[in-house]
A protein has these predicted regions:
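Short glycine/proline- and aromatic-enriched beta-strand/turn motifs that initiate or cap beta-hairpins
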Residues: 1-38, 48, 194-202
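Extracellular/periplasm-exposed beta-strand and loop segments of Gram-negative cell-envelope proteins
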Residues: 22, 50, 54-67, 100-111, ...
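Residues that define the transmembrane beta-barrel architecture of outer-membrane proteins
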Residues: 8, 27-31, 66-70, 87, ...
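Short loop/turn motifs that connect adjacent beta-strands in outer-membrane beta-barrel proteins
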Residues: 1-8, 42, 80-88, 145-151, ...
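Membrane-embedded beta-strand positions of outer-membrane beta-barrel proteins
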Residues: 12-14, 35, 47, 72-74, ...
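Glycine- and aromatic-enriched membrane insertion/assembly motifs of diderm outer-membrane
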Residues: 23-78, 83
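Outer-membrane beta-barrel "beta-signal"
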Residues: 11, 71, 75, 183-202
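Transmembrane beta-strands of outer-membrane beta-barrel pores
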Residues: 16-20, 49-55, 76-78, 95-101, ...
Length: 202
């Protein structure tokens, strides 16, 4: 994950969570660019732009979602820093939008008959042009653990507003939102190790 951050100076933050997760999980790959801009002492404009591919394996289906997403909103930093510290305890709100395609890789027809063998279909079927809209509440903290090295932990609660499903199949995963359940709500957790690269003072 790569982040551009503008506060008291122009700087760049590089996050390492998504590339590492892509290496450890062969069913998940993606990249995310995150930026924020301070508009007052406590308030930041924030956005995340990413691309993700995720394969979901259910009892009778295997499907892959692939696409891009944008999340935009604000962060409020409730922490009072001393001197030139840049730590944060923040709460944030995001509006999220994703455009993606979903491929039904394979599925098993459940006949409900224990005598007949199960019926499998391994012919992939892809539908493009799917979209998703959601809102997101974030809570987290960012702390400088060494000179220009930060660690961030955050959690999010997401509510799906609208999503388009493929014909004759339900979307199980939307890029940027994660897994989709019957309640159309979900939780997310993010952790990052970042390095701050200052470019120039204002």
């Amino acid at each position: 994950m790569i982040s551009i951050s503008i506060r008291n100076d122009i700087s760049c933050l590089i996050y390492f969570s998504k590339p590492i997760r892509s290496i450890l999980q062969d069913y998940n790959s993606g990249i995310e660019i995150v930026g924020d801009y301070r508009i007052s002492k406590k308030w930041y404009i924030a956005a995340e732009l990413g691309n993700e591919e995720f394969t979901t394996n259910e009892d009778f289906t295997n499907s892959t979602s692939k696409g891009s997403y944008l999340k935009a909103g604000v962060n409020y930093n409730s922490y009072n820093n001393w001197l030139d510290m840049n730590n944060e305890i923040f709460i944030g709100f995001r509006y999220g939008f994703a455009t993606f395609e979903q491929t039904l890789n394979s599925y098993q027809i459940n006949t409900g008959n224990t005598i007949l063998p199960p019926v499998f279909n391994n012919s992939p079927s892809t539908q493009k042009g799917l979209t998703a809209h959601w809102s997101e509440l974030q809570l987290g903290f960012r702390a400088e653990v060494y000179n220009n090295i930060f660690i961030t932990f955050s959690g999010s609660y997401k509510v799906m507003v609208n999503i388009s499903d493929p014909r004759n199949f339900k979307t199980h995963y939307a890029p940027g939102f994660n897994r989709i359940y019957n309640s159309n709500t979900g939780f997310g957790f993010n952790y990052t190790i970042s390095y701050l690269i200052p470019f120039a003072k204002k």
